[in-house]
Regions:
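C-terminal substrate-binding/catalytic lobe of Rossmann-fold NAD(P)-dependent oxidoreductases
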Residues: 1-95
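NAD(P)-dependent Rossmann-like dehydrogenase/reductase catalytic/cofactor-binding core
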Residues: 78-80, 85-133
């Protein structure tokens, strides 16, 4: 998990401390994420930033028991983020709960998004497949 995250982010120096837990769910990955920022960031600021991120849906209202569940992302492309709160152990850390459908966002949808990005950058082009005779 550490090597994969560093590779995805393109940063070998990033500090990561993962714990993998397997639970019997039909589909989906859930992650407890601890984020340390350069400057203090309030949970409200974090919600606002994440709300503007493409492919991210903030589901975060603990007072109404509204937070992301793995069942909520089955068949969806969006990644849901909630339980955004300060980490009491560090003034520049926040804790988040993140869920996503690994079959869509982790595989199929990501493959399509990568192909679209490569096409936009002119690195691949669409070719016509000849009709069968």
């Amino acid at each position: 998990m550490m090597a994969e995250t560093r590779k995805i982010l393109g940063r070998e120096d990033i500090g990561i401390s993962p714990t993998c837990v397997r639970v019997p769910v039909y589909t989906g990955h859930s992650e407890a994420v601890n984020v340390q920022t350069r400057e203090p960031l309030s949970p409200e600021q974090c919600r606002e930033i994440l709300s503007g991120a493409p492919g991210v849906l903030v589901v975060d209202d603990p007072n109404d028991a509204l937070y992301p569940l793995a069942i909520d992302v089955a068949g969806r492309d969006e990644v849901l983020v909630g339980r955004i709160r300060r980490d009491p152990s560090h003034e520049r850390c926040l804790n988040l709960w993140v869920v996503g459908d690994n079959l869509r966002k982790g595989a199929a949808t990501n493959a399509v998004q990568v192909a679209e990005l490569l096409h936009e950058r002119g690195l691949i082009r669409r070719t016509e497949t000849p009709a069968p005779a």
